[in-house]
Amino acid sequence: DNCIWAYSLMGIWAYDCGTKSWRTDLTGIWSSRPDVIIHAVAQDIEGRIWVGKDYDGIDVLEKETGKVTSLVAHDDNGRSLPHNTIYDLYADRDGIMWVGTYKKGVSYYSESIFKFNMYEWGDITCIEQADENRLWLGTNDHGILLWNRSTGKAEPFWRDAEGQLPNPVVSMLKSKDGKLWVGTFNGGLYCMDGSRVRSYKEGAGNALASNNIWALVEDDKGRIWIASLGGGLQCLEPLSGTFETYTSNNSALLENNVTSLCWVDNNTLFFGTANQGVGMMDMRTREIKKIQGQSGNVKLSNDAGNHVYKDSRGLVWIATREGLNVYDTRRHLFLDLSPVAEAKGNFIAAITEDQERNMWVSTSRKVIRVTVASDGKGSYLFDSRAYNSEDGLQNCDFNQRSIKTLHNGIIAIGGLYGVNVFAPDHIRYNKMLPNVMFTGLSLFDEAVKVGQSYGGRVLIEKELNDVENVEFDYKQNIFSVSFASDNYNLSEKTQY
């Protein structure tokens, strides 16, 4: 943008060479502030200005908008600045910003390293969106937290008359009328409407069939469908408080442990079970049947259906205890995505779709992005990319069905340590090819040295990186070459 940036201990200024004038929009940010001492300024690969300060961390300026983001040290966050006094800043050709601190050495930052933000709110078992800025977080041992993403605060959302929190929270649903429905383990079902709370407990007759509520969905008539462990499948009419109950005793329900629910269309409800695979109910007839696929077709990787999810193409994604499957409702076929998604034998916890129609799958200790394309023959092609704690994810298991795509496209995933939040379209990848350097050559496990004779011949007359080629005779047939790169962007994931 043709600006000259000047700074001293007392401030920072920018001279616009185009208008031949000093920029006035920086006044009040750093200049003329006696409490701010500036030690370093650098511009990153995205054009942002980084300002290193004394005892006050780093400010990052978006030049187009004037927005300033502050980066400071946090003792409880190992990914924050190590120290708040910054003596030097340097942006290298790979987009890495190097930071020299007063007493904590040198650190570096790259957007392609940590792709996922982490918030340590405890064991997050389910997620629902309250409004544009707030999320309800169901927890294993702290009830429901209302997390305001604007303020960063998460506070208990509701306690009963005795001051108790509903624990553990397993499922949540915001119905079309704005009520929050909460399913718990061994605590029944709650309906929260502002300050009014109604509870449903297991009982005889027209009542909740089980206090263990694993999944909740709403139909087009405003009825709440309930999946429970031990109680089968129920439909609650909220106005009358009456239940329809479907169990293995009074219907063709596969078993009474129902784990997950999803609508394929207004007339078809798919459900997962703990041990009997996936079934469906026809809403018009209430007929229930097991999803088998065509004879001879691929079967489910496991009959434990942890999560059932329908995408925008009409494909039904099924997370099981030992892999990932897709059911093509048009062709009535099961597809096994476990090998493609690096998920074979893995416990698949939860599934969601982003606004670009990519699928995101959480497993034990990693998250997988699956891209879907048409093969031009009526079927699909799948590809995947896996992420783990080295990308910023929590280093623990993710929870079943604890995933949510928010209205703005951001995805939240719950695990044992908290919630990871990310914008799929903001994930950055390192596109710079690193320099590869040869670090050693061995012959019969003996290091080859410059100018030294082996078998009557000198193999390398100068340093290995300056050699065009190396020739061995046919008897010198056991050798090894070692090499490395200057890549600091997740170097452990570098492929050669």
What are these regions (language model features)?
Residues D1, Q43-E46, A91-D94, Q129-E132, ...:
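Residue-level detector of Asp-centered blade-edge/turn motifs that repeat once per structural unit
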Residues I49, L61, V68, I86, ...:
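Fold-core signature of tandem repeat domains
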Residues I96-I113, N420-F422:
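Short, structured interface segments
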Residues G272-Q276, N302-H307, S312-R313, E322-N325:
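Beta-propeller domains
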